[in-house]
Amino acid sequence: MREIVHVQVGRCGNQIGSKFWEVISDEHGIDPCGRYHGDSDLQLERINVYYNEAFGAKYVPRAVLVDLEPSTMDSIRGGPYGSLYRPDNVVCGASGAGNNWAKGHYTEGADLLETVLDVVRKEAEGCDCLQGFQLVHSLGGGTGSGMGTLLLANLTDEYPDRITATYSVVPSPTVSETVVEPYNATLSVNQLIENSIQSYCIDNEALYYICHRTLKLMAPTYGALNHLVSLTMSGVTTCLRFPGQLNADLRKLAVNMIPFPRLHFFMPGFAPLTSRGSQQYRALTVPELTQQMFDAKNMMAACDPHRGRYLTVATVFRGRMSMKEIDEQILNVQKKNKDFFVEWIPNNVQTAVCDIPPRGMKMSATFIGNTTAIQEIFKRISEQFAAMFSRKAFLHWYTGEGMEEGDFAEADNNVSDLLSEYQQYQDATIDQEFEDEEEVEEQNDDSDEQ
């Protein structure tokens, strides 16, 4: 079987990660004690991707839970699904990272690293054919960002031929937890560019917009935000967990979605998103799902896809629906919005269908977009970073842990280069591509003649 080992790091990573396990356990008919109570063979057909079948038909998540302070772990252990996880796979420190990336990456996190890697190795050794890892973390704090990226770098070194996917919660100015978020996020994105194969960017600002505008929640809790993220993660992983043809493993998804290795930051979206009160007044149709799914208001990252162009898109429809109708609707969207899809990647929208809908829904659709508009998120972080770094504000907290100013400048430059690359491919046309190729050929011919 093609197994995936899941690693959740830091407070945010653990809260979202544990919600993800609740949602997919429910979808696969697994109760909080790990017993199967489902009603369909499809639930068990690929259960081994995320679960290990232990003694006495108990299904245990292939999950490693990491934090530098114990409070989140205590609440997970004390929660309804606390006994689902393997106790040995819960690793926590005592002191925390205090929202400091350097503590997570170089000092406190580094001290705990070998213990975590041992647990991950044990999980990986228990797999028949490991396809890769998924990391759930946030970029704004200290543990998820600093230790999360340290772990990612080590996994990339130790398992270079395996895919690493991250679900990364990006900080936003409207929902700020701490003043040093731009530093932590820039240092993290620098690492993700180099060490992640594919990253799903989830943005607190977008989640708040959805809760306010669409779901009509006046004071959204983190529970509501995490629920949105878990819906999206459940949708994104549908192809990996249930039998299907398209994007059925992490590598196939990467091959279809990533035309250039550094441009691997995806914008996820989900439909239907309707407020609880209005649900019973609407019968969902494939056209409506498709229209909602491509709508900026349904995106989990606060950037407008109409300000950029799609390099590639993958969509996952769930529920009983006609494949022909889905294909027609997707084609329709592409025709109507052809300016927002690069013309030099033909057939750049992939569609998968899974018969099993999420709990409580007849049908749903998940969107994964590789769009140049994602640069808006990085630009926002970069501007905030520059404002503080130009005054060297708060730097002493980082240099005190052994970092140097040069590390910050290097990270900022790498993010700036990424922005330029996105802009370059946003502006590229099919004619320009051919001209570039001809120029290269002419230069090669000239050098041959010499």
From Swiss-Prot:
Keywords: Cytoplasm, Cytoskeleton, GTP-binding, Magnesium, Metal-binding, Microtubule, Nucleotide-binding. The keyword DNA-binding does not apply. It comes from Bombyx mori (Silk moth). Mg(2+) binds at residue 69. InterPro entries: Beta-tubulin_BS, Beta_tubulin, Tub_FtsZ_C, Tubulin, Tubulin/FtsZ-like_C, Tubulin/FtsZ_2-layer-sand-dom, Tubulin/FtsZ_GTPase_sf, Tubulin_C. The keyword Aminoacyl-tRNA synthetase does not apply. It holds the Pfam family Tubulin_C. Its cofactor is Mg(2+). It comes from the Eukaryota. Residues 430-450 have a biased composition (Acidic residues). This is Tubulin beta chain. SUPFAM superfamilies: Tubulin C-terminal domain-like, Tubulin nucleotide-binding domain-like. One of its GO terms (biological process) is microtubule-based process.
